[in-house]
Amino acid sequence: MILLSSSISLSRPVSSQSFSPPAATSTRRSHSSVTVKCCCSSRRLLKNPELKCSLENLFEIQALRKCFVSGFAAILLLSQAGQGIALDLSSGYQNICQLGSAAAVGENKLTLPSDGDSESMMMMMMRGMTAKNFDPVRYSGRWFEVASLKRGFAGQGQEDCHCTQGVYTFDMKESAIRVDTFCVHGSPDGYITGIRGKVQCVGAEDLEKSETDLEKQEMIKEKCFLRFPTIPFIPKLPYDVIATDYDNYALVSGAKDKGFVQVYSRTPNPGPEFIAKYKNYLAQFGYDPEKIKDTPQDCEVTDAELAAMMSMPGMEQTLTNQFPDLGLRKSVQFDPFTSVFETLKKLVPLYFK
């Protein structure tokens, strides 16, 4: 779910009880509960390097409907995602990427909620996933995308991704899973983009308002979706954990059809046999293994470097698309729906004054 990763089919696939997931061979597990942030890395070591944070190129504007183009142009230019925020760094990292807060590093020590409402929401999430008895607490932590199929809107902007990762954190108060995903574009030392989303499941009452006739016929009563609360023009996307053993692998669907699926591993390079095994397993759910492409995990960032980078000043505003204070001396009136050109003329001086 960056990238929409971070990132499931509205119609339930062939019952998962009919298939047994292949046994995983790896036992290593990472529970890093880091909060991913995004930045652009420097391609070479400079005396006074700059770290520029940006969410640009996350999504292709052409993928949005024409009726939103003019409004989207203003939103993009006004939002934090359209700005480059530079920070002077004294460290010598060649690929400095700000990924979160150092306080978030470590094991996930989460407990299940005890009140009745939270327990009800937990049960709804467990039943909303194809994976039997899905446990959002055990699912939390760091996952590496080692293979994926990404077509349509959900895959926009991820075609050249390296080192795609997702960090999942279970929010007990909201009974939701926070999803922080990012990837490095073009090459191991390319620029990084990231986005934060939230996975929530819809109960029976809300589902009746939106479910299709086919879904009613199949009696699918709970569904889970990935939303991006701070970016309103991105539609909610289905989210379904097809299968997982929590310690080694997870298979995640992110579209109503068979156009988006991810193979997750707890380790960045589990080996070709691991990847081939789970590609073939997805064939039982209607996916074509030949169309599922490997995701390069070739970024040379050690855990120590990652922890150091995470101790840098936070970029929460960028990740959550919060609007910056422009410091205007007087009010400016924008009307992007009637005059895009006039709006752009007013915006340019704000960013280049």
Curated annotation (Swiss-Prot):
Residues 1-18 have a biased composition (Low complexity). One of its GO terms (biological process) is response to heat. Disulfide bonds join C163-C299. Residues 1-39 form a transit peptide. It is found in: Plastid, Chloroplast thylakoid lumen. Disruption phenotype: Increased sensitivity to photo-oxidative stress induced by drought, high light or paraquat, associated with a rapid accumulation of hydroxy fatty acids mediated by singlet oxygen. When associated with disruption in TIL, highly sensitive to temperature, drought and light stresses than the single mutants, exhibiting intense lipid peroxidation. Seeds of this double mutant are very sensitive to natural and artificial aging, associated with the oxidation of polyunsaturated lipids. GO terms for molecular function: nutrient reservoir activity; small molecule binding. Expressed in leaves at low levels (at protein levels). Present in seeds. Induction: Accumulates in response to drought, high light, paraquat and abscisic acid (ABA) treatments (at protein level). Residues 1-27 are annotated as: Disordered. One of its GO terms (cellular component) is chloroplast. Keywords: Chloroplast, Disulfide bond, Lipid metabolism, Plastid, Seed storage protein, Storage protein, Thylakoid, Transit peptide. The keyword Chloroplast applies. Pfam families: Lipocalin_2. PANTHER family: CHLOROPLASTIC LIPOCALIN, LIPOCALIN. Lipocalin that prevents thylakoidal membrane lipids peroxidation and confers protection against oxidative stress, especially mediated by singlet oxygen in response to high light and other stress (e.g. heat shocks). Required for seed longevity by ensuring polyunsaturated lipids integrity. Belongs to the calycin superfamily. Lipocalin family. This is Chloroplastic lipocalin. The gene is CHL.
